[in-house]
Structures are given as C-alpha cells and as structure tokens.
Amino acid sequence: MIFGTNGNNRMTKLAGALVLTLAAASSAHAAIQVGGGATLPALGYVGNVTHRLNSAPTSTSLFGAYKTVFANNGASYCQTGSGAGKNILAGVSGTNVQNGCPDGSATPTGFGATTVGRTTLTQPNFAASDSPLSSTDYSNYVTGRGASRPLQFPAVAGGIAVVYRNDNSTTTLNLTTAQVCGIFSGTITTWSALGQPLPISGNDTLQVVFRSDGSGTSFGLSNFLSANCPADGAGHHFITDQAFSNAVSQYGLPGSTWSGQSGNANVVNAIVNGTTDGFIGYAEAANALAVAGNIATVNGKSPTADLGDATNHKLAISSSDVVYNNAISGVDSNGRPIVSPISGAPTTSCIALVKPDAYATLAPSVSGYPIVAVSYLLGNSQGNGTDATDTRNLLGAPYNASVVAATKTIGAGKGLAFLSAPITQTQINGCVIN
C-alpha cells in the first residue's frame, strides 16, 4: 500500500500516539538503533510497512528478534530506498539522520531520529541497500564522515516479482525470460502479446510501473536483464543501474504509458489498488504478498515458493563470490557492472560485495526463481560511541542462529531469504571500532 494513505482515522491517531510514546521511552534510554534505506527487505526487517517509519518492529521480524535475543531497545527503520539510504549514511548535503521520515510519495532525506528520541545522534547507526556501494558512494561517505569508513555486509536476498493486474485473467501469468526482456525493453507492449485477455479497462496496452527513486530493486532487476537479454538489432541493451531510467535508457524509455513510483510499496499500490486494471511492473515479492497482488511466475518458478534452495530456503553465496574493498565503478560495453578496487580503501575485510554476476544468472544445477537481489546492511567504522555493541549485533543479526530461528518474516514462502555466506560476527565486531 502507499505509505500512510490507508487505514481509518482512529487507527492513525493511535499509531501517532504510539510513536510519541516510543519516542519518549527511547529518549530516556537513548539506545534504539536508527537506520533506514532499502524498501525491498523492509517487511522482513520490521514486519509492518504501513508507514515509511517503523520504530516498533513486530516480534517475529528480523529486528524484533534482534531486540529479543539481545535484550536491547531494538531498531527503527525508515524506508527511503537504497540510493537515499546510502546518501543519508554518508551525510551527503541536504540529508541528515534527524530529518523526518514522512509518509507519501516524496523520498525522505533523513531517518527520523528526532521522532524516535535520538535527538543528539549525528550519524545513522546503520543503513540498508540492495545496490552495493559504488565508487561514488564511497567517495561521498569519505567526504561526509571524515576519518570513518563505511561498512557493508550482505544480509538477505529478495525475489524481485513481476506484479500485475488484469482483472479478466483467470490464471497465473507465467513469463519466459524472453517475455520479461520484452516487457521492460518495450518490445512487448500489449496484454494480447503475452497471450492474456483484454483487461476490464478495455486498454490492451501494458501500463508499466517502475521505481522512480534510486533503488536496489531496480539494480537487481537490471542486473538480471543485462545478463540475460540479448541486445536488439540496433545494439541497444540494458544497463545495470540503481536508477531504472538509466537501465532502460538505450531503448528510449521510460515511455508515455509508463509511470514511476518511489518505494516498492508505492509501486505495488499503483498496480494493485488503482481505479482500473492493466498495470504491470516489478517489486520485491514480499510487498506484493502483503496486499495480495498478482505475482507472475518466471520460467515456471515463483519468487516466493522457489527462492533459495529447497532444503533450508537460503541463497548460497560462496567465498569466491565475495570480494572485499571493491565497489561498482561503472558498466562495460554490454551494460554489465564493473567491480573495481576502492582507491584508498582500508585493508580490513569490512566492505564485502557479492559479485553481481553470482546471482544474475542461475547456475545450471540450480532450479529456482531467477530474478534476485542481494540486500546489504551498512554501518560506520567510527563514531559509534555507546551504540557500538548494539550496532555490531544488529549488523551480524542475519548470521546469528538465535535471531534467524526467531525470525518468521524471512524464509520459506516469504519472498525473502537468508544467505549462506562467509560472514562472521567476529569479523563484524572488528569492523565497528568505536
């Protein structure tokens, strides 16, 4: 749903009172971890995404389980999108951790620290992003945070779903890779070309909804598209980028029948809850599940039922797929991301990047849903102060057996999966210095 526009007035007032109560309580303890960023993992992290800002995650969400296991004051989370989240962590001009996190279509410039009682906090405790640090992101951080350096660890994976609404369709839309390529390159423009009936609206044109903000969901989708969709006759191809308008720019898109929305929840709302049908787009699967949106299968696989391996529902990331102190430095002539060493990076193993090639195309031995994003938790090496222990534990929560066991919002059928990756709590502890 679109942030803050649904629900009755009484519930809205009660929610506001709850936020004020939580803010007063956290002010006394001054230990709630303040962060935000990616919308893709938000349901898994906090359990409820009715509002952009959630300072009371459900007990079975990742952050709720983290609070219970470590008996601390938990974490607040503001859904800004990956690009804005990285900028707020870096202290880019015009952003501030204290700035509000209001509902609506505008992308926030802060994580709402004032709202949750952390009025003296000068930098976020953490951020989340589904697009890994780029060279520009790293440079922005060094400029904004001085002696500190960013930390980055892969946390979870999400299935990127093709969400649609055709009220005359009676069966699940099953797309091939070629059809996914065609929809987002603009070569398939009608429902009839997909073998689907005319929507109730009477308009056969596919009305594509995309992410208008800097988005790790867009990065994940374009990573799949640039790896699996051949160039057209004119040599046009997809570009892996967190800005969807860049990803499809060679095709002269977005087009006049396409519309942009900020955040996964707003994309899903535009597709599912409009006054008419005929819309199609992409969003993290958990967001579509939350509002009972129609989710297409791709090559017969579901982004909820077939995400990760069939046994423990985790996405396997081998040690050879993780590189340290590298960042995305651009794209090659085929639109594939270039991973390069960071100039002036620390020698520690604190900036971990999963090679985009590792999840752009499934290995022949893997039978699962093919469009996947890897989401990261980010932090600061310096300036953590009395929050250091809580921040260490939060960044390591996706690898803590007790936290994982208590988390019910990530796993089988949820559209989100934990990772089997070579990251340890000891490693993270050594990265959060003070």
Q: What do these predicted ranges mean?
A:
Residues 30-434:
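Flexible loop/hinge segments at secondary-structure junctions
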